[in-house]
Amino acid sequence: MIDEVEEIAVKSAYEPGPYGYRPQERPIFLYLDHGLIILDKPKGPSSHEVTERVKRILEYPGKVGHCGTLDPKVSGVLPIVLGNATKLSKFISGYDKEYVGTLYLHGDVPIDELKGALDKFTGPIFQRPPVKSAVKRSLRVRRVYSIELLSSEGRFHKLRVRVESGTYIRKLFFDIGEFLGVGGSMRDLRRIRSGIFTEKDCVTLEDIKDAYDSWRESGDESKIRKVILPLEEAVRHLPKIYVKDSAVASLTHGASLKVKGICSLSRGIKKGSIVALMTLKGELIAIGRALMDFDEMLSADSGVAASIERVIMPRDLYPPMWKTG
């Protein structure tokens, strides 16, 4: 979770001031505004429909979105973002994905021949989005990282597939069938991982309703804080730069991070890499891009350490301290 051990180097020792909150300690309404739900989407409704259902269950007045659309017939891991966390939608949607699905071949094919075809479709492939897709149907390259044959029963073959975001699994299965000369189709599909989030992180719509009802009826926030995660969970895998309170407000206005604003940072940061810019209380300020490597950030007395890719934190949580940052 958020408190997992990181290898951090201290550049300048500072204690957090009175501003902001540790993510798990945000007041409940602010907690919801920075919320992330890893939903186990059921088969049947569309991703949009289950997102709206979550919004209704929580009686949430703000924005609610989902990251990485699943077709109605597909189940599994679907990140849902609330309020301020919707600013992370594009970032979370860009994660690689992992699925388990059934390929039905329309003719008999020897297992060795099928395995050979799966090898052929591992690596960069060309895909054109389906006719019903919401995006422009231009030919694009997507990477298939692995295809594993889990089991076979007659013409039904259970596969585990790890792919780049934006890869159409139904089209992939169809193309494998065409390559084998017998035709093929997808009979079922479940997403078992979206980036760093797996089935183990998932909650159901029923879990969300139970937690919300418990909170509204008894005032007990414990369940709602378990089914809804702080948005910081989405960046737990990223290298981090922790900044002085005096630097926070300028970052929320899109200013680049200067070396003088750094308190501590993850070891091994490379120039050009994506980093999470954090407050001393562990709040995500922005997604940034490192303009120096770790050693340079640690030793430099001046210069710009990171640029801003996407501001996440609202501007009014930390006061401007331009002269002291």
From Swiss-Prot:
Catalytic-site annotation from UniProt: D71
PROSITE patterns reported in the protein's UniProt record: PUA (PS50890)
Keyword tRNA processing in record: yes
Enzyme Commission number: 5.4.99.25
Domain PUA as annotated: residue spans: 238-313
Family: Belongs to the pseudouridine synthase TruB family. Type 2 subfamily.
Protein's name in the database: Probable tRNA pseudouridine synthase B
